[in-house]
Swiss-Prot record:
Miscellaneous notes: The basic functional RuBisCO is composed of a large chain homodimer in a 'head-to-tail' conformation. In form I RuBisCO this homodimer is arranged in a barrel-like tetramer with the small subunits forming a tetrameric 'cap' on each end of the 'barrel'.
Modified residues (N6,N6,N6-trimethyllysine): K14
UniProt propeptide residues: 1-2
Name the record gives this protein: Ribulose bisphosphate carboxylase large chain
Keywords of the record: Acetylation, Calvin cycle, Carbon dioxide fixation, Chloroplast, Disulfide bond, Lyase, Magnesium, Metal-binding, Methylation, Monooxygenase, Oxidoreductase, Photorespiration, Photosynthesis, Plastid
Nuclease recorded as keyword: no
GO biological process: photorespiration; reductive pentose-phosphate cycle
Function: RuBisCO catalyzes two reactions: the carboxylation of D-ribulose 1,5-bisphosphate, the primary event in carbon dioxide fixation, as well as the oxidative fragmentation of the pentose substrate in the photorespiration process. Both reactions occur simultaneously and in competition at the same active site.
Designated gene of the protein: rbcL
A Pfam family the protein falls into: RuBisCO_large_N
SUPFAM superfamilies per record: RuBisCo, C-terminal domain (SSF51649), RuBisCO, large subunit, small (N-terminal) domain (SSF54966)
Length: 475
């Protein structure tokens, strides 16, 4: 073919590089109910206009590339491209902007969190025109939500399975997290459950190591569960971590847990991956297992305020992928969490409909159209003196998880569990009687400790423990 011959596909095609904003910045665009909406915190490189930066994000996370290509003429860019439809400055921050981007629903595979994230955040975060980029929030349209199964069971079904109502659930992470033999590990589980806890937990990095292979751990923990249930008359559980190096091995562990008749298994959803997590969630629903989710590795992604992905987005993704519990910070313990922001994504986990509320970091109204809710788990450096605040902040639909705050009791694991259960029951009773947990919390705990020697001992041990550090994300 002669170099001068013009094909139909090349009509109107002009090679070269053009500004993203000419195609992808569309402030006149009216968003559709079926669009996935994203709010990005954008920090452009010096000299890059915010409109160009926002348009670049929209382009590189949808149909764009660095140059004009002739195959653009073979499809409808207007139908498939992402659009930066609004930009606003971030108050109090120099050269930072919130760029709002709308994505057509046809860009995403149904029921795949993996594909959604691959498109929206898979490539654009290394873009040279940006100094930093953070995904602050997503609006998932109802049409897309309905393609997901979501949590295996949800909050109400879990309460019915456990026959426990009107209070937060109590848990404990077995410590030391690594090094115990399976038999000693099972003994610690039994003591905690016998003392009054609802759940005990594998730590996130307990998988199948030389000192404790997974099958041995599962067997001894199942024995502990059944023994504690027989003695207390309550349904008990232990989060058996099924996370493994392959999906096949993960499923083998989940199947063995089901055969043992235990109520719940666990997965590290970020290190394990969304595809593995969704696979496990589907199995758990089909086989009556609850699924506890640990967020190991989240701070690598969400801790910095100007780069990464906010945890509220990871929480939404988990609700879509599937999990009945997820760790959500404490506000009061050793791990970071601002109260209003934390409660914002806690509501996104539990509630069916959440209104836009920028004061709590919620950029979009979200309708989950009856997708089951997820119980937030508060854990990390908490003890009995935190119980009133935790009960007030998280409410009944939560799991309060005390690791060192149970196993660090001077009299042992079972008395540590007793102390936590007594403290919780005292706080719930006081709240139900109309007392203010925020102002009277310490008094409520002291009153309960007068008739519970286990609680009195715990109060004495942890009376001066505080975690007061400056947040590193101010750097």
């Amino acid at each position: 073919m002669s170099p001068k011959t013009e094909t139909k596909a090349s009509v109107g095609f002009k090679a070269g590089v053009k500004e993203y904003k000419l195609t992808y910045y569309t402030p006149e665009y009216e968003t559709k109910d079926t669009d996935i909406l994203a709010a990005f915190r954008v920090t452009p490189q010096p000299g890059v206009p915010p409109e160009e930066a926002g348009a670049a994000v929209a382009a590189e996370s949808s149909t764009g590339t660095w140059t004009t290509v002739w195959t653009d003429g073979l499809t409808s860019l207007d139908r498939y491209k992402g659009r930066c439809y609004h930009i606003e400055p971030v108050p109090g921050e120099e050269s930072q902007f919130i760029a709002y981007v709308a994505y057509p629903l046809d860009l995403f595979e149904e029921g795949s969190v993996t594909n959604m994230f691959t498109s929206i955040v898979g490539n654009v975060f290394g873009f040279k025109a940006l100094r930093a980029l953070r995904l602050e929030d997503l609006r998932i349209p109802t049409a897309y939500v309905k393609t997901f199964q979501g949590p295996p069971h949800g909050i109400q079904v879990e309460r019915d399975k456990l026959n426990k109502y009107g209070r937060p659930l109590l848990g404990c992470t077995i410590k030391p997290k690594l090094g115990l033999s399976a038999k000693n590990y099972g003994r610690a589980v039994y003591e905690c459950l016998r003392g009054g806890l609802d759940f005990t937990k594998d730590d996130e990095n307990v998988n199948s190591q030389p000192f404790m292979r997974w099958r041995d751990r599962f067997l001894f923990c199942a024995e502990a569960i059944y023994k504690a249930q027989a003695e207390t008359g309550e349904i008990k559980g232990h989060y058996l971590n099924a996370t493994a190096g392959t999906c096949e091995e993960m499923m083998k562990r989940a199947i063995f847990a089901r055969e043992l008749g235990v109520p719940i298994v666990m997965h590290d959803y970020l290190t394990g991956g969304f595809t593995a997590n969704t696979t496990l969630a589907h199995y758990c629903r089909d086989n009556g297992l609850l699924l506890h989710i640990h967020r190991a590795m989240h701070a690598v992604i969400d801790r910095q305020k100007n780069h990464g992905i906010h945890f509220r987005v990871l929480a939404k993704a988990l609700r879509m992928s599937g999990g009945d519990h997820i760790h959500a910070g404490t506000v009061v313990g050793k791990l970071e969490g601002e109260r209003d922001i934390t409660l914002g994504f806690v509501d996104l986990l539990r509630d069916d409909f959440i209104e836009k509320d920028r004061s709590r970091g919620i950029y979009f109204t979200q309708d989950w159209v009856s997708l089951p809710g997820v119980l937030p788990v508060a854990s990390g450096g908490i003890h009995v003196w935190h119980m009133p605040a935790l009960t007030e902040i998280f409410g009944d639909d939560s799991v309060l998880q005390f690791g060192g705050g149970t196993l660090g009791h001077p009299w042992g694991n079972a008395p540590g569990a007793v102390a936590n259960r007594v403290a919780l029951e005292a706080c719930v009773q006081a709240r139900n009687e109309g007392r203010d947990l925020a102002s009277q919390g310490n008094e409520i705990i002291r009153e309960a400790s007068k008739w519970s020697p286990e609680l009195a001992a715990a109060c004495e041990v942890w009376k001066e423990i505080k975690f007061e550090f400056k947040a590193v994300d101010t750097l």
